[in-house]
Curated annotation (Swiss-Prot):
Record keywords, A-Z: Host cell membrane, Host membrane, Host-virus interaction, Lipoprotein, Membrane, Myristate, Viral immunoevasion, Virulence
One Gene Ontology CC term in the entry: host cell plasma membrane
Compartments (UniProt record): Host cell membrane
Pfam families, per database record: F-protein
GO MF term list: GTP binding
Main localization, broad class: host cell
N-myristoyl glycine lipid modification positions: G2
Gene from which the chain derives: nef
The name this protein goes by in its record: Protein Nef
Record comment regarding domains: The N-terminal domain is composed of the N-myristoyl glycine and of a cluster of positively charged amino acids. It is required for inner plasma membrane targeting of Nef.
Note: The 155 isolate is from a monkey imported from Kenya.
Alphabetical list of InterPro entries matching this protein: HIV-1_Nef_core_sf, HIV_Nef
Length: 230
């Protein structure tokens, strides 16, 4: 037999249990810690859901900083999603040094997808190429190096079948207002950091996979620091 005080205590616990379960449920967004070690796709979906849950309806007469707009004032919304790159932000495969076979496969993949051949060179696009190779193929970004200019820039990675060739714009493109400031062809960017006044574009050359002669002119700079010891 139990004690006489056990029944009141049991009723008290039952009352508390009912009160807790009668409380309206609240949904909370996921924090970052539970996502560690999960796939990048899951993290992106959770991140989008969390950002949507944090969006509040904004008064049309208020700025994001809380300042009330006066008569005649306008505020234009903008989004930084336009600058987002459409691939994962972390490697999805094990990291590895590039090999001859991997360089050839990567080159032909880019050629078949049409994502590089004939594209104007720019520092931003070159960084995107490095990120894509790192995140999708696991290639460490020390492979993307070129011979010095001016003239054709050849890849120092044997097996990579793209080279940078100087191209000339037709007169209409040079005078068009759309190309004056934002077009990569007007930036005159060069992988060696020196402005040679050339407009460069990636060009696919399958012969780069079979022709490798260190004595050729574009490889001489690789041995410029090597002594001629006995």
């Amino acid at each position: 037999m139990g004690l006489g005080s056990s029944k009141p205590q049991h009723k008290k616990q039952l009352t508390i249990w009912r009160a807790l379960h009668a409380t309206r449920h609240t949904r909370y967004g996921l924090l970052a810690d539970p996502l560690i070690g999960q796939s990048s796709t899951l993290q992106e979906e959770c991140d989008k859901g969390l950002r949507k849950s944090l969006i509040r309806k904004r008064n049309g007469n208020m700025t994001p900083e809380g300042r009330r707009l006066q008569d005649g004032d306008q505020w234009d919304e903008w989004s930084d999603e336009e600058d987002e790159v459409g691939f994962p932000v972390r490697p999805r495969v094990p990291l590895r040094q590039i090999t001859y076979k991997l360089a050839v496969d990567f080159s032909h993949f880019l050629k078949e997808k049409g994502g590089l051949d004939g594209i104007y060179y720019s520092d931003r696009r070159n960084k995107i190429l490095n990120l894509y190779a790192l995140n999708e193929w696991g290639i460490i970004d020390d492979w993307n190096a070129w011979s010095k200019g001016p003239g054709i820039r050849y890849p120092r990675c044997f097996g990579f079948c793209f080279k940078l060739v100087p191209v000339a714009l037709h007169e209409e493109a040079e005078t068009c207002e759309r190309h004056c400031l934002v077009h990569p062809a007007q930036l005159h960017e060069d992988p060696d950091g020196i402005n040679h006044g050339e407009i460069l574009a990636w060009k696919f050359d399958p012969m780069l996979a079979v022709q490798y002669d260190p004595s050729r002119e574009y490889f001489t700079d690789l041995y410029s620091t090597v002594g001629t010891g006995n």
